[in-house]
């Protein structure tokens, strides 16, 4: 398996290749293969990472840095790797990146806290990397803390939110150099509390889910410890507003199915939260280690993921039931989503500002390393052959020109 990390201390991309069962706290145990690339220092550290796959199947790594640039790297990184393309957004060095993800087959979208979104056509910039590029840009009301999209469920839709910026879903259309944006859903805050005080808004995570009716189903996590479920046919206020914890929620990711999500707070808890009503669920009894079936009619925290010392800052889930987390203790942990068992634990030695799970196939780290080394050597060989062919073509053209000159002089 392979994960890319953004190292805040050095500004590098760290590639971690590992097996399930690894634990770096065991001195004589197997160790992951950790390699650093593109270290530009803390002042230019990466705030967001994204994997981009073009319509032709070519993969790239996109990185949004603190200095306001977006860099595009080859997927198979080497110690000599440099960006294929660098885009500088005006004024972005004064404003943090709050999101970076693939928008469509060839486009990556990057968002700033001030509400600006940039759409970069990776297929274009990697071919014409030496030419000036002006990314199509549009703005929405800020400040934003996060944005989300789901290319399969709701293509062309992006949801945004932030501090005193309630959930809003926009429809986007990118044609050439122009971007058009239209608001399609604006959430309303919940009603005032029992002492008639306004409930504050501070969205920290957004997640689209499949809808069985026309409209959107959107989940949000907040810095006030709430998880909210919006169904647009239900109304502009959340269908559910559940207080999960007293601590701020920092993350939000899909669970095993549409009935649950995974989140973490600013203390040390990472948990599965189930919000499907009128169903039977199985909860573990920690006293006797036996499972018991319960009828549940309201959302609840199902199970917690153990082990983290301090806040989990970033997490990501995979389609094959894995959860990866990194936190203040500088450990990368891998969990089984269903059982909550920790299947790998690795000290990465840096504060992590972004996390990208790019390969969930359960091969051994050594097998993966051998495969990728062979791929890199093949790429280098083809590049060398291309260079030789270009040189021979130039010589052939030069020889033809010289021959023509001699014929004319004769």
Curated annotation (Swiss-Prot):
Disulfide bonds: none annotated. One of its GO terms (cellular component) is preribosome, large subunit precursor. Its main location: nucleus. It comes from the Eukaryota. One of its GO terms (biological process) is ribosomal large subunit biogenesis. Residues 366-385, 390-410 are annotated as: Disordered. The keyword Zinc does not apply. Residues 374-383 have a biased composition (Acidic residues). It is found in: Nucleus, Nucleolus. InterPro entries: WD40/YVTN_repeat-like_dom_sf, WD40_repeat_dom_sf, WDR74/Nsa1. Keywords: Nucleus, Ribosome biogenesis, rRNA processing. CDD domains: Nsa1. Involved in the biogenesis of the 60S ribosomal subunit. Component of the pre-66S ribosomal particle. Belongs to the NSA1 family. PANTHER family: NOP SEVEN ASSOCIATED PROTEIN 1, WD REPEAT-CONTAINING PROTEIN 74. This is Ribosome biogenesis protein NSA1.
């Amino acid at each position: 398996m392979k994960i890319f990390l953004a190292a805040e201390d050095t500004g590098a991309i760290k590639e971690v290749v590992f097996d399930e069962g690894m634990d770096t706290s065991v001195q004589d145990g197997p160790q992951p293969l950790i390699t650093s690339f593109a270290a530009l220092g803390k002042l230019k550290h990466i705030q967001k990472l994204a994997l981009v796959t073009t319509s032709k199947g070519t993969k790239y790594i996109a990185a949004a840095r603190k200095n306001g640039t977006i860099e595009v790297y080859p997927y198979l990184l080497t110690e000599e790797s440099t960006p294929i393309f660098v885009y500088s957004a005006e004024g972005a060095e004064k404003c943090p990146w709050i999101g970076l993800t693939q928008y469509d087959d060839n486009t990556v979208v990057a968002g700033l806290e001030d509400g600006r979104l940039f759409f970069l056509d990776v297929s274009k910039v990697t071919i014409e990397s030496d030419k000036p590029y002006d990314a199509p840009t549009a703005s929405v009301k800020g400040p934003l803390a996060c944005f989300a999209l789901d290319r399969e469920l709701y293509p062309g839709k992006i949801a945004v939110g932030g501090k005193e910026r309630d959930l809003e879903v926009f429809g986007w259309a990118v044609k050439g150099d122009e971007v058009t944006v239209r608001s399609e859903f604006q959430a309303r805050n919940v009603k005032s509390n029992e002492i008639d005080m306004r409930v504050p808004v501070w969205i920290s995570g957004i997640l689209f889910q499949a809808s069985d009716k026309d409209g959107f189903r959107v989940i949000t996590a907040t810095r006030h410890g709430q998880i909210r479920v919006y169904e647009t046919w239900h109304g502009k206020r959340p269908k559910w507003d559940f207080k999960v914890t007293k601590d701020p929620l920092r993350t939000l990711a899909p669970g095993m199915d549409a009935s649950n999500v995974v989140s973490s707070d600013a203390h040390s808890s990472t948990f599965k939260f189930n919000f499907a009503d009128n169903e039977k669920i199985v909860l573990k009894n920690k006293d006797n280690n036996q499972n018991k079936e319960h009828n549940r009619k309201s959302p609840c925290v199902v199970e917690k993921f153990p082990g983290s010392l301090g806040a989990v800052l970033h997490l990501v889930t995979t389609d094959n039931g894995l959860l990866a987390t990194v936190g203040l203790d500088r450990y990368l942990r891998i969990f089984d989503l269903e059982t909550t068992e920790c299947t790998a634990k690795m000290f990465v030695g840096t504060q992590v500002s972004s996390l990208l799970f790019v390969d969930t196939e359960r091969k051994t780290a050594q097998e993966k390393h051998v495969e990728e080394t062979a791929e890199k050597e093949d790429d280098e060989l083809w590049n060398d052959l291309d260079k030789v062919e270009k040189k021979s073509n130039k010589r052939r053209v030069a020889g033809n020109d010289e021959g023509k000159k001699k014929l004319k002089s004769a």
